[in-house]
Curated annotation (Swiss-Prot):
Major location category of this protein: nucleus
Annotated organism of origin: Arthroderma benhamiae (strain ATCC MYA-4681 / CBS 112371)
Tagged with keyword Thylakoid: no
Biased segments, Basic and acidic residues type: 117-158, 265-276, 313-325, 333-349
Name of the molecule in the record: rRNA biogenesis protein RRP36
Gene that encodes the chain: RRP36
Lineage of the organism: Eukaryota, Fungi, Dikarya, Ascomycota, Pezizomycotina
Chain segments carrying region Disordered: 1-174, 259-278, 313-349
Signal peptide: none
Composition bias type Acidic residues, residue spans: 36-64
The UniProt record lists the keyword Oxidoreductase: no
Length: 349
């Protein structure tokens, strides 16, 4: 009965999963282990039976008879199923060789799949890189087109007098201009003899409200000999003008002579104003000392010019004064005529 139970187990194991190869291997291993265990049990039983008395031999004969009777009772369908289940196991070497071939095929398939997957991944990566490059190129083209459109838009102003518009989306330069060579103050040479900062305190001359007078006074005191040189140069130029015959040379000499005379006249006027101012200050100090005044009265610039002009005409002779007054009248008349409207200027002319 034990053999029929084993056969039934084999049949059920095969029925459980006929399609899977791994279950067949497991069932074959179980059958081998069971058969080996049965053989070991039978060997042990034989050894024990050989060692035992003849009574045991009779019991063995009874057991064989029982097995034969049990085998005779098994149906042909069960035997066919058992044969089907045991058929592949009898060809163990071939089955094993077939399994190795299947494993090799599976490995080859996996290798080919891995290779295909690797090649597919590489192709996909290349495709992505190609797409990225195409997108980048398209973006650069779009940016160029947009820049051109912006430039055209910037150039197209409402009028030529309209201010130019510049976008603030420009990258800041990484370089910073620490010292600009154009805006750096260049070293200028100066002569301290003619510098007002030095002359204002030279020779005991203190600063006053008339900043132009004290510097001129210091320069006049220190370089009074230059007036003699200027007079000599003026006479020399007049002599050259008298001897010259070319028109261009005469025009150039006349221009130089007039500029020198104007400069000399301006210096004389400044000196006259300085003398008038000095006389006025001296007079005011004397009045304060005498107690006739409590506070000094300071001349305005307009009053100072009037006093200087009055002193100038008083120092002149009769004919020279008349010429000076006539010259002054013409100068004032021309100035007023320039300020007059054009319609009135024509009527009076």
């Amino acid at each position: 009965m034990a053999l029929s139970g084993i056969l039934n187990k084999r049949v059920t194991a095969y029925r459980a999963d006929e399609n899977e190869l791994e279950d067949d291997f497991s069932s074959s291993e179980e059958l081998n282990t069971l058969s080996s265990e049965d053989d070991e049990d039978e060997d042990e039983n034989d050894e024990s039976e050989n060692e035992e008395t003849p009574d045991n031999t009779s019991s063995e004969d009874d057991g064989d008879n029982d097995i034969k009777s049990s085998l005779s009772q098994i149906s042909f369908g069960a035997l066919a199923k058992a044969q089907q289940s045991l058929g592949p196991l009898k060809k163990g070497a071939k089955r094993k060789h077939g399994s190795e071939e299947e494993e090799e095929e599976e490995e080859n398939n996996t290798n080919t799949k891995y290779k295909k997957s690797k090649s597919d991944a590489l192709n996909e990566l290349r495709e992505r890189i190609r797409r990225a490059k195409e997108e980048k190129a398209s973006k650069s083209e779009r940016s160029r087109d947009s820049e051109l459109l912006d430039k055209k838009h910037k150039e197209a102003r409402s009028s030529k007098h309209a201010p130019a518009v510049q976008s603030s989306k420009y990258a800041v330069s990484r370089r910073r201009v620490v010292v600009d060579g154009e805006n750096v103050a260049q070293a200028k040479s100066r002569d301290p003899r003619f510098d007002s900062a030095v002359q204002s305190y030279s020779h005991g001359v203190k600063s006053s409200s008339y900043s132009t007078s004290h510097s001129d006074l210091a320069a006049a005191k220190n370089y009074a000999f230059l007036n003699e040189y200027r007079d000599a140069e003026l006479k020399e130029l007049e002599e050259k003008l008298r001897r010259s015959k070319e028109d261009d040379e005469k025009a150039r000499l006349k221009k130089m002579i007039t500029s020198m005379k104007d400069r000399k006249r301006a210096m004389e006027n400044r000196e006259r104003e300085r003398q008038v101012l000095a006389k006025h200050r001296k007079k005011e100090r004397e009045l304060i000392k005498e107690g006739k005044k409590e506070k000094a009265w300071f001349l305005k610039k307009a009053d100072l010019k009037k006093e200087a002009l009055k002193e100038k005409y008083e120092s002149m002779g009769a004919k020279e004064r008349q010429k000076g007054i006539e010259r002054r009248r013409k100068k004032v008349a021309s100035k007023e005529k320039k300020e007059m409207p054009r319609s009135r200027r024509i009527v009076e002319g």
